[in-house]
Amino acid sequence: MSSSPSRKNPRVLFVTSEVFPLCKTGGLGDVSAALPAALRELKADVRLLVPGYPSVLSGLKYKRKLAEFDLLPHFPPTTLFSSRLQINESVSLPLYVIHCPELYQRPDGIYLDDDGQDWPDNAQRFGLLSKMGALLASDASPLSWIPDIVHCNDWQSGLTPAYLHYHSGKKAASLMTLHNLAFQGCFPPDEVARLGLPPESFSVHGVEYYGNLSFLKAGIYYATRITTVSPTYAREIQHEPLGFGLQGLLAERSNAITGIINGIDTTVWNPATDPHIVKKYSSRNLAAKRINKLALQREMGLEENETIPLFAGISRLSYQKGYDILLQVAPMLADLPAQLVLLGKGDQSLEKQLVMLAQTNPARIAVRIDYDEALSHRINASADCFLMPSRFEPCGLNQMYSQRYGTPPIVHTTGGLIDTVTDLAPDTPAGESASGFHFHEMTADAFMNGIGRAIDAYYNTRLWKTLQHNGMRKDFSWRSSALAYLSIYSLLMQR
């Protein structure tokens, strides 16, 4: 619903299936806490709508009953509660919680059972989330607080814009944020009627997708505007292969799509205050990185040598992350000479090959098969250069963490890696705004060329410090992301 001209601060209903620390399976949970918190600090009236999983209900200090619903004939009775989620000392998020034990009271995961299979009623579970989001964003809401904008996230809330489209009364504008296009929420066509969508919605100009109902396609098709997690990725998804079959529709809606980089928690990722590292430092005393470097070499069993370039990678070990290419490059890197530290888990074949590689050259290569948050901080603080050869990367986080720690990254030119890492181009030898290195072809030779460029720069002390300072000065805060979202909200309120 359009805003009163006298009220500039937007009212936003943020619909999500995850929010940290109550429920999280991946990055969406982090975003759903951090972005609304940053928006509230900028005076936006943002409130969250989340399913009442057991972890949500048990994690809240209080719940106040607001209303009871029988939303659709095929939906169980539902109660809406309100609560608040404390994010930090200064910010708490108002929460609306959908209490429906028949759909959400599950002993295992949010989306999957203990066998790793999708819950068979996921269409109803997240259809209810979407339907409630649409109801609260329309003149049919039982609440006095009505949003100007309903902000939907990934397929789980993708039906909200569709429900709003078929609501004949006043309704909020809708924003659909695409965090992960690979998961599209596809279900058999008989779910259309069960979820209360009209028959005419099941068409190519609607929710139909290769003979099935797709929640994600519905969100893309019906939303007033669309965002995704970096400007380059916003362009990439309009073409194969990164459109995952939706590239045609996304290209049709290109004028409605905006890419906004995710933020990072700059209080957690800050070498000046980091409790996990041996020696704290800032851009004014970068020499302290050497102390961290020697400590990490000792911890990982590498030769202690503060002058040899130390490269690092922290990642899920997978084909998508380019670790098959890194596996080819690692022996060449060790022969330069240079050192390599890797931390991560994933594909078992890659894990075994990387461990074997480290065993053949323990003074130069160290591999830790694990997820270790504290160690990841120490690696960022200690390494000279960070490796990120992802085949595709919608936004990426590790390249932002590394720059915060004065560790220039070497990245494949894709998605958010392009948008967050400024290449040291051959025609700018003084560094200027450069903060890292790009390589373009997804080959070992191209990757190795990028590493070679980095080593040349590393031995140019003045140039290397320029790269470090440039990266550490970049603003990767959630405040920066929130300001970009406020611009989108402003456009939606003017419609």
Roles of regions detected by a PLM:
Residues M1-R495:
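Catalytic cores of nucleotide-sugar-dependent glycosyltransferases that transfer UDP/GDP/TDP-activated
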